[in-house]
A protein has these predicted regions:
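Conserved beta-strand hairpin/beta-sheet module of binuclear metal-dependent hydrolase folds
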Residues: 1-46, 117-132, 137-138
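Core dinuclear metal-dependent hydrolase active-site scaffold
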Residues: 2-6, 16-19, 95-124, 128-129, ...
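Divalent metal-coordination and catalytic microenvironments
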Residues: 18, 28, 54, 66, ...
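Active-site neighborhood of phospho(di)ester-bond hydrolases with catalytic His/Asp-centered motifs
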Residues: 26-27, 47-56, 74-79, 106-109, ...
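Active-site metal-binding loops of divalent metal-dependent hydrolases
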Residues: 29-30, 55, 79, 111, ...
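Active-site metal-binding motif and surrounding structural segment of the metallo-beta-lactamase
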Residues: 33-75
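Metallo-beta-lactamase
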Residues: 101, 111-228
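Rhodanese-like catalytic fold shared by cysteine-dependent sulfurtransferases
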Residues: 142-143, 155, 202-238, 242-244, ...
Length: 470
């Protein structure tokens, strides 16, 4: 028997590959199937089952393409309803893979169909729990995402989650290894640990949600402090339930090279968003007017979903040479399949063609230090509120990037402000969005708070001084 965790940092997501006796199972696969196909071929095994822990909201699973290419059966937990062929398992149902077994544990709460998969080894020992979004390391799945489809409140779903965890998971042996679907950085939880696997015994000791005195306290703790989910989550759920275009077709369409004239014409005719995925430094120096920057060198896919929102938005790509396929692949993971092509030769080709360009007004933290001491200034901090509360520039306002589509209309076009994030990655995104919407009354700080913290600019770490602009 072999268990392999295939972890994707950009999504903080874990897929699992299990082999035994010439057969294999994959749990919660990503959209692109070729890496799995290659593993199967290398190991000389036949994929028998594709297990889905639930209808994922934060990414589009590869279950359909993988099933088409391997003839493996797709398995969901009880109550799941799909528009494609799938085995809807019963609670406690056993599936055999070679010499091992997988038992379905129906654990509703995060969603109604949410299920964990308990691995029983060749000797009959319960050895691993693939816990999906039911149990994370340090946290549990948020119970607010399925309210509409379940016709239940988040408190009612949290109550179901309590029953699932306390009656089905906690009675399991301490030595069982827990393999969750997500780790730190995922929007599917609020308090996840950085580790990607642990023993159930250690989680029983350290996970706050597993140490509540009763259901009421559990509901209160689990629902407290939940941030609104990204808008694209609902669309990803529908794609996972109903189906989607083949990844191969999406990739073929997205990898259409376009010379500047073609690129410009398609942008005008289609209304496509020009998405520039270069680093924030390269983008700030020069870019195609109206384009939006979300760099591949960071949490690319989640930010695309948070900022672009509509998965049906046509997209044209500007990338560094050789990064086109990675960009299309990572977009498809969160359901953005309408990539119409990429700018052949990248931004350099656009410049050489003599077409109009734009740039971000960016200054160094040293220059910012001089200016802040010379005059009264307005400062916008677009980091998460938790980062701001930990430490921030004295008198800075908190406006998290995740909510830019809500707060940008509050900006006074004639009032200048300085803007920063943690390192420059997020503030360049914000700058590109602001300039695309016609705002040019700001200066972005290179290197973000990390660089600013090395200067003498006054800082504060008192939460009571938080200034949040609605």
């Amino acid at each position: 028997m072999k268990i392999e965790q295939i972890y994707t940092g950009c999504l903080a997501q874990g897929a699992y590959y299990i082999t035994s006796g010439g057969e294999a199972a994959i749990i919660d696969p990503l959209r692109e199937t070729q890496p799995y196909i290659e593993r199967l071929k290398k190991d000389g095994v036949q994929l028998k089952y594709i297990f889905e822990t639930h209808f994922h909201a934060d990414f589009v699973s590869g279950h359909l393409d993988l099933s088409r290419k391997t003839n493996a059966s797709i398995v969901y937990g009880p109550t799941a309803q799909t528009e494609f062929d799938a085995i809807i398992a019963e609670d406690q149902q056993i599936f055999e893979i070679g010499d091992v077994k997988i038992k379905v544990l129906h654990t509703p709460g995060h969603t109604l169909e949410s299920s964990c998969y308990l691995l029983i080894d060749e000797s009959g020992n319960e050895t691993a729990l693939f816990s999906g979004d039911t149990l994370f390391l340090g946290d549990v799945g948020r119970p607010d995402l399925a309210q509409k489809s379940a016709d239940m409140t988040q408190n009612e779903l949290a109550g179901l989650l309590y029953e699932s965890l306390y009656h089905k998971i906690l009675p399991l042996a301490d030595e069982i290894t827990v393999y969750p679907a997500h780790g730190a950085g995922s929007a599917c939880g609020k308090n996840m640990q950085k580790e990607t696997l642990d023993t159930l015994g250690n989680q029983k000791k350290t996970n706050y949600a597993l140490n509540q005195k009763d259901k009421e306290s559990f509901i209160k703790e689990v629902t407290d402090g939940l941030l609104p989910p990204p808008a694209y989550f609902g669309m990803n759920v529908m794609m996972n339930k109903k189906g989607y275009d083949s990844f191969d077709e999406v990739l073929s369409q997205g990898l259409q090279p376009l010379v500047p004239e073609q690129f410009e014409e398609i942008a005008e005719v289609s209304g496509a968003l020009i998405l520039d995925v270069r680093s924030n430094g390269r983008f700030a120096e020069g870019f195609i007017p109206q384009s939006v920057n979300i760099g591949l060198d960071g949490d690319f896919a989640p930010w695309v979903g948070a900022l672009i929102v509509d998965v049906n938005q046509p997209i044209l790509l500007v990338t560094e040479k050789g990064e086109e396929e990675e960009a299309v692949t990572r977009l498809s993971r969160v359901g953005f399949d309408k990539v119409l092509g990429f700018l052949e030769g990248g931004f350099d080709a656009w410049k050489k063609s003599g077409k109009e360009t734009d740039a971000v007004h960016r200054i160094s933290p040293e220059q910012f230090e001089k200016e802040i001491h010379q005059k009264e200034v307005k400062i916008i901090d677009i980091r998460r509120e938790s980062e701001y509360n930990a430490e921030h520039i004295h008198e800075a306002y908190s406006k998290p990037l995740a909510y830019i589509n809500e707060w940008l209309h509050t900006i006074e076009p004639e009032e200048h402000f300085y803007m920063h994030c943690g390192s420059g990655y997020r503030s360049t995104m914000a700058a590109s969005i602001l300039q695309a919407r016609g705002y040019r009354n700001f200066t972005e700080i290179e290197g973000g708070f990390r660089a600013i913290s090395l200067t003498s600019i006054p800082k504060s770490d008192f939460v009571c001084q938080t200034k949040i602009l609605k």
